[in-house]
Amino acid sequence: MIGTFNETKLAVTQKTSHSEVRLPTVCVAILNWRGIKYLPSLLSSLLSAVNKYPGECPIVVLDNNEGDDTDRTWIRQNFPTVRVIQAPANDYLYSYNWLLQQLTEQIVILLNNDLKVDENFLLPLVKHFTNPRVFAASSRSYDWEGKQVTSGPYLFRQHRGWFYCTPDLAKQFTCHTLFACGGHMAVDREKFLDIGGFDRLFYPAYGEDIDLGFRAWQKDWISVYEPESIVYHAQSGSWNEDTSDRKAEYMTLRSNFLFQWRNLDRFPFAWLHAVYLPWLRLRKLLDGDRVWLKAYGEAKAIWQQHLISNSNVNFKDRHLSKDLKRICGTKF
């Protein structure tokens, strides 16, 4: 059986118009690595969105390309109002952890470079942060052509001891979500830094945004799915062209193991995982599923090292069932 949560009506944020409250300060931060293919579309559409936004919203490009200034030069020549910052090193999206320490805005909207945005993209996200409990808000995404919705609120699920989460594409209304998608999310900067930003346990990628959202829920901070804010995504466009589906599957599986071992260490989640994992591993051995077996082996090694390095961390005060019941895609 797949474990889900019963829906109860919960207020995601305060029902006030932006004219009645003072919006927080905001900026957009774009993570870039050799993104010249998509940057023209993203920056052009983003400038249109900024022009429609009822407040100030500077744009920052965080360039992860250390040795080549081609993108930085092109941006400065073609979009002079966009601020370009070179990251200290190519640290994948963990460069955000460094950047948000440098910025001063209350809300930072994190974007991959393989997007373009709707002109009304900004306000539906930012308005949620008039509620002090909101940690993050995520946009609705379409494919690049705008034909197919590819996002929804993420719901927690566990099937025979295996954690996974998938977007519920049918729920296209403002609601809670397990996490805000790291490729297009607005986040409260101080809260982000308070919980340590993206955890390097998941380096280089996949799963870090799930873990971030889950840790925020542990602090009683909510994440919101906001379909009125729209982006268009070129799937995996920000990765190397040689990043295969099998590699993406492997990285996702590895991160799922790490997330479960890090966060779901209470009954019944840990118990179900411990019971079913030997059976699942045997089945994968018999099937010859090398991707799964490799992901499990590497995740186990990473986790053992993590336990050694973080032996003083105490999670005894968490109440997982209570927290997870709130993460259920409830209607606003």
Predicted regions located by residue number:
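Non-catalytic, C-terminal membrane-associated alpha-helical segments of glycosyltransferases
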Residues: 31, 266-332
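Short aromatic/hydrophobic "clamp" motif used to bind/position activated sugar donors
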Residues: 108
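Short, flexible, basic/aromatic active-site loop/helix in glycosyltransferases
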Residues: 157-177
